[in-house]
């Protein structure tokens, strides 16, 4: 596997964080419902924040909500998301062996990037706390790509920021969203089994063809499959 760069997801791929996503989504849903969204049509457990926002945008369009009000709601939602993530930094930890693996990958001359749907400041603080920040050439968080994962624009934009092409990189992540993002960009993908939901992290509990126990296993895997 010839590579010039690697794009990593952050949460449950490199770091073990305990962002209370259900609470975050409940707060967002409460805000939306108090501003005219039909009650009971959004779920904090069955829908991602991206899906919730897609439904919100569609409803705003249907309701003819003024752009100024839409912008106010988007800003309020962003505050909820940022607050939930930054609160988690205090208890966040490196997934065992990951920092050493990242150091080894960087020593091989690879360009490394973070592509997360989390807040940029949260990503930076998480990487600093775990000693990995200096190894990354590109860090892209929420709102910093034309579209978030799993849309193809997320990876396509990231590789351009890395000065590479999709053929030069592999995406590494713990969740179906990461896998779908890679598939949508026709990018190679390596899964890691460090997601909190185990096999339920993958659609129909079917993991990707390449699934490592952890990013800690990535350097020897790439060494064994280099060509």
Residue spans for each PLM region:
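Conserved phosphate-coupling serine/threonine residues in phosphotransfer and NTP-handling enzymes
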Residues: 13, 116-118
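N-terminal helical cap/lid subdomain that shapes the substrate entry/recognition surface
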Residues: 1-96, 103-104, 108
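Polytopic alpha-helical membrane proteins, predominantly small-molecule transporters/carriers
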Residues: 89-90, 114-116, 171, 175
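Asp-based, Mg2+/Mn2+-dependent phosphohydrolase catalytic module
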Residues: 1-6, 103-106, 120, 124-227
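Residue-level marker of regulatory loop/turn positions in helix-turn-helix DNA-binding domains and
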Residues: 94, 115, 147
